[in-house]
Amino acid sequence: MRIRAVAGWALVTTLCVFAGACNRNGIDPNLPAITVQPVNTTAAAGSTATFTVTATGQAPLAYQWFAFAQPIKGATSSSYTTKTLAPSDNNSFYFVLVTNSLGSIESNEVLLTVTTTTTSTASANTLGNANPADVLTQHNDAGRTGLHSGETLLTPSNLNVTKFGKLGTLITDGEVDTQPLYASGVTLPSGGIRNVLYAASEHGSVYAFDATSGAVIWQSGLLGANEQPTDSGTCTSTPQERGITATPVIDRTRGPHGAIYVIANTKDSAGTVIQRVHALDIATGSELFSGPMLIQASANAGNSVNSSASQNFDAARYQPLAGLQLVNGKVFAAFGPNCGAAADSSWIMSFDAASLGPAGSLYLAPAAGPNAPGFTAAGLSADSAGDLYIFGQATYASHAPGSANVLVPASAGNAFLKFSTQNGLALTDYSKTSTSGPASVINSGTQTSSGALVVPDFTDDAGRVWHLALGAGGDGSISVLNRDVLGASGLQPTPILQVIWGQTAQSGVTGTMAYFGSTAFSAISGDPIKAFALNDARLSTAPVSQSANTLGASGAQISVSANASTGGVLWAVESTGPGILRAYDATDLSHAVYDTTQAANSRDAFASAVSAVPPTVAGGRVYVATKGGIAVFGQLK
C-alpha cells in the first residue's frame, strides 16, 4: 500500500499516540485506511469494468478515482464503472484516493485488460506481441506509417491551448536523437505494473521512465570502462557526442520481461571507435543474452569503383542512423557514412534477436559516380512478409559474402530497394523515380529522401488488393510503387506506378511521410504540410488539404494518433529555431487545433527539438525528443 501526496490534495498525519487513540499498530483509526483493495480486472471490448474499494476512518469519507494519474470526472464513490470499453483501453491503470478531514490514502494501482477478437489492419507491424497501446519501434510500426491507432484520450475536439499543454521535461544526460518508445503494462521486479517510456541519449545512456509520474525506473549507461561517446569530428550539423543515434526497437516476447535492442558508439582511451549491439531487459535495464556483442562484418566488394577488394566494416567510418528494425527474429541496422567519411558506401547488418550473434550483412557501394546509399533517421521499413525497403537517393551495388554482384544502374536517382531477409540479406528488386522531372533537379545529387512508407494492404474499387509503398524525394517528387513488382528485370528498372511532381518543395527531407485513413501526409521544408488521398492505388495529384503555415528549413517530423479510424490528429515537430509542437485535424489540415506558441508567457516552450525525430503519442500524452531530454505534453489539470 502506498501513501503519498497527490496534487490538489493534502496528506495529514495525526499523532494519535499522544491522544491515546491509536490501535494496536500505533495507527489512528480515524485516519482513512483501505481494508479491501481494488483488483486487476479483465473485460471484453464493448462491455464495462467495475473497480471497488472498501475503506474505514472518521466519516465522512470522500473518494476520487484516477486513470493514468488524472482524476475521472464524477467518479467519487467507493466503486467506479468505466465507460464502454474499446480495444485501445487495454492496459489502462486506475487507483482511488480516499480522504477525510484528517488525511488521505491512495489505493494500489490496478490494471485493466481489455480483450478483443478484432485484428488491427492499420500497419504492417511484424513485432511480436505488440499491444495497440505500445510504440515499440521508430515511426510507430514496422511499415513506418507514423500511425498510433490506440489513442483514446486526445482528439481534435478536446485539443486546445486551454486544456492541453506542457507537463514537464524528463531530463537525460545528453541530446536525444532517437524516438521515445512506449511499452504498456510492464511488470517490474518489485511487483508493480507500469506504463514505461524509453529514451536513449547521445551520451550512451538508456532510460526507463514511469510514463505516469515521470520517475526514473532505471538508467543503463552503455559506455565500457575508460570509454566515452564518439564525437562528430568536423560536422556542425550533428551532435557533438555520438552515443546512441539509431532509434532502438523493443520485442516484448524476449527475455523475462521483454528486450530493447540498442546500438551504442563508444571510443576507448586510445581513440579506437567501437560499436556494440545491446539487448536490455525492459523492466530492469540489465544486459540480456550475454551481451553486448561487438559489431564486425566483412564482404567481397569487387565492382567498377572498388574492383576485387575485400571490405571490412570500420566502426569509425560508418554511423548507425536509421531506426532499428525487427523482422523474422532478427534485428536489422543500417550504417551510413559518418560525417562524410566513406561517402561512397554503406552497410546493412542483422543480428539474431535471441543471441545477438551476426545473422547476415550486406555491403552497398555505388555502381558509378560518387553517390552513397542514403540512410536518414527514418527506420528501415518492413512488410508483413519480412522484406525490407529503402528509399534513398544513390547509385548502388550490393555485395554479400559469396554472392554475385548485383549492380543498379548509375541513373538510379531516388531508388526504391527491396531486400529479402529469409536467408541472410539479399537485394531482390528495385525501382527508380521517373526522370520526367526537371533535369537540374534529377541530376543535382544534393537532395535527401524520406525513407520508404509501407502502406497497409489497399483494396481498389475493382476489389484488387495492392501492396504499395510511398516515398517523398528531396527533388520535389512523391512516388507510389507496387512492392510486389518494383520492376528490376535483367537489371533494367521499369517505371513505377506513379510519380507526382511539383506538389512538394525541392528541398531536404529528413523523415518519412505518414499515413492514416487512405491519406498520405508530407512535411517537407519550405512547404505546408500536405495531405494526398489514395484511390485506386494512385495518390491525388494535388493535396486534398494543407496547413496554413509553411515549414522552416528543417521541415517537420510527423506522426498521427487516432482511436482506430476516428479522432485522427496529425502531430508535427518543427526544429527550425525554437522547437514547436503543432497539432492538426488529420481530416482537414487547415484546421490547426494547437501549437506550443499559443499559450501566454511561454508556458509550453521547450528546449530545442532535434531535427529528425517524430513525436511519440501514447496514453494521452505526447513526447518530444530535445537536446536535453524529453518534453512531455498532455491534458492540463
Predicted regions and their residues:
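Surface-exposed, proline-enriched loop/turn segments that connect beta strands in immunoglobulin-like
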Residues: 36-40
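Mobile, glycine-rich extracellular loop/lid and propeptide segments
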Residues: 125-460, 464-489, 509-532, 555-562, ...
